Design a protein with these regions (language model features):
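Membrane-proximal C-terminal cap and juxtamembrane stalk of leucine-rich repeat ectodomains
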Residues: 1, 6-12, 201, 246-303
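Structural signal for repeat-unit boundaries in curved repeat scaffolds
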Residues: 7, 28, 38-41, 52, ...
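LRR N-terminal entry segment and analogous cap-like coil->beta motifs
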Residues: 8-57, 61-64
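Conserved LRR concave beta-strand detector
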Residues: 12, 33, 43, 57, ...
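Leucine-rich repeat
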Residues: 21, 42, 66, 89-90, ...
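Recurring C-terminal helix/loop segment of individual leucine-rich repeat
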Residues: 22-26, 46-50, 70-74, 94-98, ...
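Ankyrin-repeat and related helical/solenoid repeat scaffolds used for protein-protein interactions
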Residues: 186, 197-261
Length: 303
């Protein structure tokens, strides 16, 4: 018997049969959501989604897809969600999203993408969520994300990014969450965050940052969470203090120089230090291995 046979008039189709190797046929036109996940599916025919004019969600995670046909999504202009997590994709056809201008949620996490093509994003003005984590990206072309004016969350964590191109975030006025954790970033340009004034959560932990440009976080007046843990920072930059809850700040695992500039900044902004126990001074010698928070509020700092 063929695994996972479609039911007539059903609106949702789910198949997680490990032996499935061909995309199911005969799905009813009433289908709104398809989940074919954790299977042996390695290829899709160009007509896989033909006759499904109402399809809004397509979940294809944890299969063995190494390529997608350029015309795959042409029959489904109503698509809102596409999840391709944990496949073997090393590239996508340039025009794959040309007809899916209603797409809101695109997940490409856990593939083998090395290069981003700006053409992918040209028609995705309604996209709100883009997950490109855990690929092999070494760069993001300038302006690649410029059409994504509705984007609220961008995940580029666990790639191979050593620098961020000037203008990489241009056009992302609605962006609230940016994850750059686990890359190879050694430095950031002073104007990096100017295009994203709505940012609320910024994750930069587990990079190779040695210094931050003066005022780099000044445009981020709505920032609630800033994670700089496990970099190589000795001096700190922070966004301006804003009304409302204190900034959640993780600066653990850095070799902090507990000089007057750092201590005065922490006193002024008064962030909520996450993992304060692992946030230690590396210098000067008299403060070495003491908690930054303790030194900041001690009365013996000569500042």
């Amino acid at each position: 018997a063929v695994p996972c046979s479609p039911q007539p008039d059903a609106t949702r189709f789910v198949c997680t049969e490990p032996t499935l190797s061909a995309f199911p046929t005969g799905l009813p036109p009433s289908t709104v959501a398809i989940s074919v996940e954790f299977t042996a599916l390695a290829t899709l025919p160009p007509t896989a989604l033909a006759g499904l004019p109402r399809l809004q969600e397509l979940h294809l995670s944890s299969n063995r897809l190494a390529a997608l046909p350029g015309a795959l999504l042409r029959p489904v202009p109503t698509l809102r969600v596409l999840d391709l997590t944990d496949n073997l994709l090393d590239e996508l056809p340039a025009g794959i999203f040309t007809g899916t201008s209603l797409l809101q949620h695109l997940v490409l996490r856990g593939n083998r993408l090395r290069v981003l093509q700006p053409a992918w994003f040209r028609h995705l003005a309604q996209l709100e969520w883009l997950d490109l984590a855990a690929n092999a990206l070494t760069e993001v072309p300038p302006m690649a994300f410029h059409p994504l004016r509705s984007l609220q969350s961008l995940d580029l964590s666990h790639n191979e990014l050593a620098t961020l191109a000037p203008g990489m975030l241009d056009g992302l006025k609605a962006l609230e969450r940016l994850n750059l954790e686990g890359n190879r970033l050694g430095t950031l340009l002073p104007a990096t965050f100017v295009p994203v004034p709505s940012l609320r959560l910024l994750f930069l932990q587990d990079n190779k940052l040695q210094a931050l440009p003066d005022g780099i976080f000044l445009p981020l007046r709505h920032l609630h969470v800033l994670d700089l843990a496990r970099n190589q920072l000795r001096a700190l930059e922070l966004p301006p203090r804003s009304p409302g809850p204190a900034l959640d700040l993780d600066i653990s695992g850095n070799p902090w120089a507990c000089e007057c500039q750092l201590l005065a900044l922490l006193r002024r902004v008064s962030p909520q230090l996450v993992t304060a126990r692992d946030t230690l001074c590396a210098s000067p010698p008299r403060y070495r291995a003491r908690e930054v928070a303790t030194v900041t509020w001690a009365g013996d700092t000569d500042c």
